[in-house]
Amino acid sequence: MPIEIISILIAVFPTIYFLFFFHSKDKSKKNSIHKIFPIFFFGMFMIIPVFLIETIIDNIIKEFYFNIYIYSFIASFIIAGFCEEGAKFIIVKKFVYDNPHFNSIMDGIIYTIAASLGFACIENVGYTLSMGSNVGYIRAFTAVPLHVCASGMMGYYIGKAKTQNHPKMENYYLKNGFIRAVMIHGTYDFLLFLSAGDPGYSDLSILIFPILIISFTLLYKKVNEY
C-alpha cells in the first residue's frame, strides 16, 4: 500500500472514531449518523476559508515584529482559537441550530463535535502528508482530542442556549460556549507555540496533556448527564 494512503488513513481514522464514539453516547438515538455526516463535511470544507483568513492575519501581525510571547498569544487565541472555533460555531448556527429537531443539549454537543472533527480531519491529512505518519500518530492523541474538547464544550452551551425561552439567556449561553472553546483551544496552542519558539519554555508543551485530560473528563461527564 502506498505510504500516502497509509498516512491518509492514519490522519482520518481518529476523527471517524471520535465521531462514532460520541454518536453512540446519544441516549435519544434521534440523530442518525446520516444526519451528522453533512455537518462533518461542512467542517472539512470550512478549513479552506479559515486557512486563508489565518494566513492573512498571520502575515499582517508578522509585520509588527512582536516578541515571541505576544506573537504566541495572538497566534493561539486569535488566529487559531477565534478563527477555528468561530468557523465551527457558524456551521452549527447556520445549518442545524434553527432546525426544530435540534432541541437538546446533546444535539449541541454531537453536531458541534461533528463540525470540529471534519475540520480536524482535513487538518490532520495536511500535516500527516507534509510531515509524515509519525505526526499523524501524535495528533491522534493531541490535536484531535483538542478539537473535540474545545468544540464539545462549546456544543454543550449551544445546546443549552437552544433550550432557553428568553433571548437574553440564549445569547448568554452562545457567547459563553464560544469563549470557553476559544480559551481551551488558545491555551493549548499557546503552550505549544511558546515551547517551540523559546527553548527556555520547551517543557511547557507537557502541560497540554493535563488540559486535554481535564477538558475531556468534563466533557464526558456532561455527555453522560444527557
Name each model feature, range by range.
Residues M1-Y226:
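Hydrophobic alpha-helical segments at protein termini of multi-pass membrane proteins
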